[in-house]
Structure formats: structure tokens, C-alpha cells
């Protein structure tokens, strides 16, 4: 049973209007995507997600360089200096989302983030009428691997981004530790429209993003 639900705020008419706006001006878009009858088939689905909280710490060693050039007669002299740079830091993650349904392409679900978690409500079946609702088929342990990768990449990016003032920076080593503090099973709202065209399945997700699978 889900712990939390993020109720639909965008109703079907608003979702259709957003989709039409996204399609507007795309002169070569096949009619299979934009016909009124097809857009009417848009569906609201509560997608199962696992949300992970964690404390993370990371440290890294980097090689940085600066270069300067000056002319000496007919020659251009370039001087490159190398620096040993160390960085370390800590951060906290709250509610890193990973969809728990194999029917939902992970890349598509990532693309429609972020969600406004301030609108979360304790789960109640009263929010479900009028919408489809999936149950997870990937458990928290399976999904935690994706959350772990996302957190590691985020910490690595923040460490690297803190190194400024050099012409180049290369990573020599990094050590990142993630300590999970909580996980939550939640239902998040997604508007979906599937289209078959030229033998491929296409999907529009909530804010009018389209991709092929």
C-alpha cells in the first residue's frame, strides 16, 4: 500500500490544452499525433515511485592546469602549471524518485521531474477515481540501485563544479559514501498519450515531451 500520493492538479482539459500548444507550429507532425480524436485518448495515471532519503559524503583528488603564453622573438612560449587539488563535502538527499514500474521508461519518467513534493498527501483511495493506478513491479531494493547512481553522479558533479579558476581539471580519484535514512512508496501523477506511427510506439508525458521507443 502506498504511503503517499501526489494528487492530480492538471485536469484532462488542461492536459489536452498543453499538448495542443506543444504540437502547434510543428508543420510536419503527422496527423496521427495531433488529431482531436486521438488527443481525447490522453489518460491520467498514478505511477508508482520509490523515494529515497540519504546522507552523502564525498572526497576527490583532481589534477588541474593553468596555461599562459607569451611571444619571444619568433617563438610562442606556453607555460603550463599543474596543481594537485583536493575537495571534500557532505550533502543530504530528500525524496530522490525512481519509478517502480517496468512499463514506464526510466528516461521518460526522469524527464518530467521535478515534482512539487509540498503537495504530497497521505495515501487515500479517494484520490484514485477517474485515473488509472499502477502497482509497483520493481521493489525498493531494485530501484535503490538507480537512486544510488543518481546520488553518486550528483555528488561527483558538485565536487567537480567547486573547482574553478583553472584551464582544465581531470579527476584522479573519488570516494563517495551514501547512507540511506528512509524510503517511501508513493504514487505520482502522469498524463500519458500513446501513438503508433511507422511501426514505433511514441508517448507524450505530462508536459508534452515526446520520444520514441
Where are the language model's segments positioned?
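Charged, low-complexity helical/coil segments in non-catalytic cytosolic or luminal regions
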Residues: 2-200
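Juxtamembrane amphipathic/hinge helix adjacent to a transmembrane helix
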Residues: 197-213
